[in-house]
Design a protein with these regions (language model features):
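RNase H-like polynucleotidyl transferase catalytic core
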Residues: 141-142, 162-186, 202-207
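Short small-residue beta-strand/loop micro-motif enriched in glycine and branched aliphatics
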Residues: 107-112, 174-176, 200-201
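Acidic/histidine-rich, metal-coordinating catalytic segments
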Residues: 133-155, 179, 184, 231-236
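C-terminal domain-tail junction helix/linker
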Residues: 167-171, 192-263
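Mobile-element integrase/transposase regions
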Residues: 46, 53-103, 108, 120-124, ...
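Basic, flexible linker segments flanking DNA-binding modules
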Residues: 1-17, 21-84, 146, 153, ...
């Protein structure tokens, strides 16, 4: 038999990244796909599966007893750990930008569309999210993008506007490690979910149409989408359950709140 045919989707460097990630994490195929999608946007499930087959990593190694290794348990985060990210979308009016935030534990999600991805836009988006959430947010996680943190060559008198909002609200701003974008994979997956539910499925004549549908989708997601990770609860129901368990971390009763930025 000859050598396995080379990928027509992935470069040699991208294949090396995918295989190294698989061998290091021992994660299932779908988890690898979600984590690597931010680094390799054109990646698909079949392409990743074929890549693993070519490199002999399509099957996870067996443990000492001949069993598959136990799944690694994700680190538990208290409610209020908030990844924030930026995504590009194409519309009739040109390139637009989505700022997205999702609570890692409650899964409550917020997003806004903007024509520009400026520092002040990111900062004001964060302010609106923090004002809307009915509980304390101790930590915000972002990548090293210019919208979220100063770059090496920049001098910003008074500091970065995103960091100023964090200080104002008493929030710790953490950054993902360079070349480790999968550490912010949850919000990357939410980016993908939003795109699949909006711009990849519908044609919008104006960005106002996109805005309206985006906010309607998020309201339905927060209040009607029952999630397996929340044991069948919606994000809003989970927040209300946390209110009953630990009201001290809340700033107000969430029971009758509508979890949307413009409601």
């Amino acid at each position: 038999m000859g050598p396995e045919p080379a990928s027509t989707v992935l470069t040699a460097e991208q294949e090396a990244i995918a295989v190294a990630f698989r061998r290091h994490t021992l994660l299932p195929l779908d988890d690898c796909l979600y984590a690597l999608y931010a680094t390799i946007p054109q990646l698909s499930r079949p392409a990743l599966h074929r890549c693993f087959q070519r490199h002999g990593t399509s099957r996870l190694p067996l443990g000492e007893a001949g069993q598959s290794p136990p799944k690694k348990k994700c680190k538990d985060y208290p409610i209020g750990y908030l990844p924030v990210d930026l995504a590009e979308v194409q519309t009739e009016e040109g390139k637009q930008y989505l700022f997205v935030a999702i609570d890692r534990t409650s899964q409550v999600a917020f997003a806004e569309r903007h024509p520009r991805a400026k520092r002040v836009v990111a900062a004001e988006f964060l302010r609106r999210v923090l004002d809307k959430l009915p509980y304390q947010v101790p930590t915000v996680l972002t990548d090293n993008g210019v919208q979220f943190t100063p770059q090496a060559h920049q001098f910003l008198p008074g500091g970065h506007s995103f960091d100023r909002i964090c200080r104002e609200y008493g929030v710790e701003h953490r950054l993902t490690k360079l070349a480790h974008s999968w550490t912010n994979g949850q919000v990357e997956r939410m980016n993908r979910t939003i795109k699949e539910a909006t711009v990849q499925r519908y044609h919008y004549q104006t960005t106002n149409e996109l805005n309206g549908h985006l906010q309607a989708f998020l309201l339905a997601y927060n209040h009607a989408k029952r999630l397996k990770t929340l044991r069948g609860l919606t994000p809003h129901e989970f927040v209300c359950a946390q209110w009953q368990k630990n009201p001290t971390i809340f700033t107000r009763d969430p029971t009758h709140l509508t979890l949307g930025l413009y409601t």
